[in-house]
């Protein structure tokens, strides 16, 4: 029966290796017989959601029997004020992942090509395959995007380029100058999507100001952002894109009419107003990164300086073994084997106590391997 069912699906769908999210914490606690687990694997906000967002959700609950506002009018209006971008240049998605999917569906046909880095967000190749297109993976340069390499990989079949900036899972970034030189050379019929999911954690002074290109209506530039990371709303699934009015108009044509639920819209709009919460989050991540760097140097481990809320490190041991060893002690991190980094793990910056516990457990494991 399974073999017969397989034949119903297109061949390029059959070949897809699905994205594998981590197991729920409660399930792992039962399986591992642990009383509590610290999760530093998915780059979530350790402070939780904004209190203003929670209050907004409570006020909105009595109206959940009504369909949500299809255009996300209130949230788009708040973002327009925040970013200084007209409302017709913004679209809200069920997480920024949905907008990545809209771009793939809108631009890709079988045989088309998508270019990105060899070590970047795993959703890019999956959605490329869903559309029957070819994913072109350009080797990294210093654990980041090689923009010159991407330019050299462009062919007449190239339709989309994805650039995660800062990059996930490495935390590296491309600079303002690099981006300007890159954009000037990309053919106008190729859409370049800058995925800025982690932009709120950036401290580099030469990080590119991509919203400037949106304000000047560059027709082939799209910028993605999310409320899942710094704003602490990962469970509600809210993201957005900024692009030219024409681009946004076409994306609206193919999105689901009620794609973002009413509680998510309300919470996101309220979260934008909670500047103190955002400041606390940034401070926590900044200090947490420095703490981890110092401890990793003490252990003699290589790490990649990060502009995001996570740190990528080389343990010198099999990444899956390190993952399992930490999991048995109640700590979830992310093995990077799926990215071809066989001895590397990625760790979300948590609260100070969580970061300290991670360091203690990693140190204990490494000593046991000597």
Task: Please give the residue ranges for each predicted region.
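PLP-dependent aminotransferase-like
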Residues: 106-163
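Short acidic capping loops at alpha-helix termini that bridge into adjacent secondary structure
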Residues: 36, 86-90, 110-113, 157, ...
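PLP-dependent aminotransferase class I/II
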Residues: 50, 71, 220-304
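Phosphate-binding glycine-rich loop
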Residues: 64-113
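N-terminal "arm"/small-domain region of PLP-dependent enzymes with the aminotransferase-like
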Residues: 2-66
């Amino acid at each position: 029966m399974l073999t017969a069912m397989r034949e119903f699906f297109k061949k390029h769908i059959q070949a897809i290796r699905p994205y594998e999210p981590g197991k729920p914490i409660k399930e792992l606690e039962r399986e591992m017989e642990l009383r509590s687990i610290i999760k530093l694997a998915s780059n979530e906000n350790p402070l939780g959601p904004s209190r203003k967002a929670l209050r907004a959700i409570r006020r909105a609950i009595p109206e959940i029997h009504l369909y949500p506002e299809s255009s996300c009018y209130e949230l788009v209006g708040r973002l327009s004020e925040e970013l200084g971008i007209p409302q017709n240049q913004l679209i809200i998605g069920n997480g920024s992942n949905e907008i990545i999917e809209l771009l793939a569906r809108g631009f890709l046909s079988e045989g088309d090509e998508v270019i990105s880095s060899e070590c970047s967000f795993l959703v890019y190749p999956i959605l490329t395959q869903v559309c029957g297109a070819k994913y072109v993976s350009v080797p990294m340069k210093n654990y980041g995007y090689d923009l010159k390499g991407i330019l050299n990989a462009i062919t007449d079949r190239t339709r989309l380029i994805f650039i995660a900036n800062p990059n996930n899972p490495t935390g590296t970034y491309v600079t303002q100058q690099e981006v300007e030189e890159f954009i000037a050379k990309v053919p106008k019929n190729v859409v370049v999507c800058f995925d800025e999911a982690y932009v709120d954690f950036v401290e580099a002074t030469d990080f590119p100001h991509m919203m400037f290109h949106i304000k000047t209506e560059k027709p082939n530039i799209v910028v993605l952002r999310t409320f899942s990371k710094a704003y602490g709303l990962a469970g509600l699934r809210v993201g957005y894109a900024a692009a030219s009015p024409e681009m946004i108009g076409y994306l609206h044509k193919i999105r689901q009419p009620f794609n973002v639920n009413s509680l998510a819209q309300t919470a996101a709009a309220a979260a934008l107003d909670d500047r103190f919460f955002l400041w606390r989050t940034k401070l926590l991540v900044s200090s947490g990164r420095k703490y981890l760097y110092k401890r990793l140097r003490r252990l003699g481990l290589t790490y990649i300086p990060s502009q995001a809320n996570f740190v990528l490190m080389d343990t010198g041991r099999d990444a899956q073994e390190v993952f399992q060893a930490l999991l048995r002690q109640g700590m979830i991190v992310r093995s990077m084997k799926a990215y071809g980094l066989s001895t590397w793990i990625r760790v979300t910056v948590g609260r100070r106590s969580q970061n300290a516990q991670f360091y203690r457990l990693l140190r204990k494991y490494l000593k046991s391997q000597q």
